[in-house]
UniProtKB/Swiss-Prot annotation:
Residues 57-106 form a coiled coil. It is a peripheral membrane protein. GO terms for molecular function: Atg8-family ligase activity; identical protein binding; protein-macromolecule adaptor activity. It is found in: Preautophagosomal structure membrane. Transmembrane segments: none annotated. This is Autophagy-related protein 16. Keywords: Autophagy, Coiled coil, Membrane, Protein transport, Transport. Pfam families: ATG16 (PF08614). Stabilizes the ATG5-ATG12 conjugate which is necessary for autophagy. The ATG5-ATG12/ATG16 complex is required for efficient promotion of ATG8-conjugation to phosphatidylethanolamine and ATG8 localization to the pre-autophagosomal structure (PAS). Also recruits ATG3 to the PAS. Involved in endoplasmic reticulum-specific autophagic process and is essential for the survival of cells subjected to severe ER stress. InterPro entries: Autophagy-rel_prot_16_dom. Its main location: membrane. Belongs to the ATG16 family. The lineage of its organism: Eukaryota, Fungi, Dikarya, Ascomycota, Saccharomycotina. GO terms for cellular component: Atg12-Atg5-Atg16 complex; phagophore; phagophore assembly site membrane; vacuole-isolation membrane contact site.
Length: 123
C-alpha cells in the first residue's frame, strides 16, 4: 500500500508540474529579447524616429499626388480645349470646301458660257 501511495504522489507531482508549465507567464518579446529598460527605450526612440520618417514620407507623397492631380486636370482641360478647337477647324474646313466647290462650279459655268458665246459668234 505504501508503494501505491508513493506512486500516486509521484504521479500527482508530475501532473502538477505539467499543469504549472501550462500556465507560466509568457514573456512578450519584440525582436531580440529586451532584458533592461535602456534597450526598451532605445527601441522606442528608434520606432518613434521611424514613425516620424514615415509621416514625412506620407506628406511628401501626398504633395506629389496633389501635383499630379493638378497636372492631370490641366492636361484634361487642354485636351478638351484642343478637341473643341479641332471640331471648329473641321467645321470651317468643311464650309470652305463647300464654298470652294460652289465657286469652282460658278467659274466653270461662267467660262462655259463665255466659250459657248465665242462659239456662237464664230458660227
Amino acid at each position: 500500500m505504501d508503494s501505491l501511495f508513493v506512486e500516486r504522489l509521484a504521479q500527482r507531482d508530475e501532473v502538477e508540474g505539467r499543469f504549472c508549465e501550462l500556465f507560466k507567464e509568457v514573456q512578450i518579446m519584440v525582436g531580440p529579447q529586451l532584458e533592461d529598460e535602456s534597450m526598451e527605450r532605445k527601441l522606442i526612440v528608434a520606432l518613434k524616429s521611424d514613425l516620424v520618417e514615415k509621416d514625412l514620407r506620407i506628406g511628401e507623397l501626398e504633395e506629389i499626388l496633389q501635383l499630379r492631380n493638378k497636372d492631370y486636370e490641366r492636361l484634361n482641360d487642354e485636351l478638351i480645349s484642343l478637341n473643341i478647337e479641332n471640331n471648329i477647324l473641321r467645321d470651317k474646313l468643311q464650309n470652305m470646301t463647300e464654298e470652294n466647290s460652289k465657286l469652282v462650279k460658278r467659274w466653270l459655268n461662267k467660262v462655259q458660257q463665255e466659250a459657248d458665246a465665242m462659239n456662237e459668234n464664230l458660227h
